[in-house]
Amino acid sequence: MGVLEKIERLIPGPMIQRNRRILVALFAILSAALILSSYFFPYWKFTLVAPQYPQGLRVQVYLSRLKGDVSELDILNHYIGMKKLEEAAQFERKIALFGLVVLSLISLFFLFSGRKGAIFFVLPSLAFPLIFIGDLFFWLYKFGHELDPNAPIKIAPFTPKILGEGVVAQFKTYATFGLGFYLAILGFVFVFLAFVLRLGVCNACPVKEKCSVLCQNLWKWPGKPEEFERAGMKEKALILRQQKG
């Protein structure tokens, strides 16, 4: 017996719904893996080109740390009265790994969601990249507007660009999202695809009217009179018994 045949026996039901349920599981697992792996890659990258640094100063922003030319950039920022980069998002960086693990588990638990609860397992994956962008903008705005009035170089308050090319005083800046951010986006895409497929499965389920937040028929497809009775659908169970009798 081949692997596919073994899977088919483990997951009974109409062929199209069986295949959909397999894809739902694969997409949910892949989504969780992508979201969790994004922790190990930068979410945002920033480059500043100055006369004394023609090759540019580069900083990579991870969820829990900063890498790159952080010290050199802090020295330049000191002249315009900006705080050190390490002072930004300290709380967010402390809880980043815990939050990402929870988010990955939510995507993984989508496997067990019922018709009524499926959307609640999708929304966190959508909200996470948006929250990251909002939090990043907040700190860029805060650092660019809370400049030390006694700084050697006086410049007007500003907000560094999140994406694209910008200018700060005589310096040019370039900002892009990193691989970690795109992995998180891809994680949402896969859990959304799982959600769409799950809707098709749930809509075809004979006991969908009795479905709750968690699916009680995850590994089986309702088809026996006893299963409809347990779902509270006694009339359906009676019809099936009459058809078999």
Language-model-detected regions and their locations in the chain:
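Alpha-helical transmembrane segments and their helix-start/interface "positive-inside/aromatic belt" motifs
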Residues: Q17-A32, R115-A127
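Juxtamembrane loop-transmembrane helix junctions in multi-pass integral membrane proteins
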Residues: P12-I22, F91, F112-K116, V168-L179
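Hydrophobic alpha-helical membrane-insertion segments
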Residues: S31-W44, V122-E146
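Intrinsically disordered terminal tails
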Residues: M1-L26, F41, F46-Y53, R58, ...
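Terminal transmembrane helical module of multi-pass membrane proteins
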Residues: H145-G223
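Hydrophobic alpha-helical transmembrane segments
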Residues: A25, I29-L34, F91-F112, Y182-F192
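Extracellular-facing segments of soluble proteins and assemblies that are Gly/Ser/Thr-biased and enriched
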Residues: I75-L140
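Long, glycine/tryptophan/cysteine-rich extracytoplasmic
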Residues: F40-E92, F138-A175
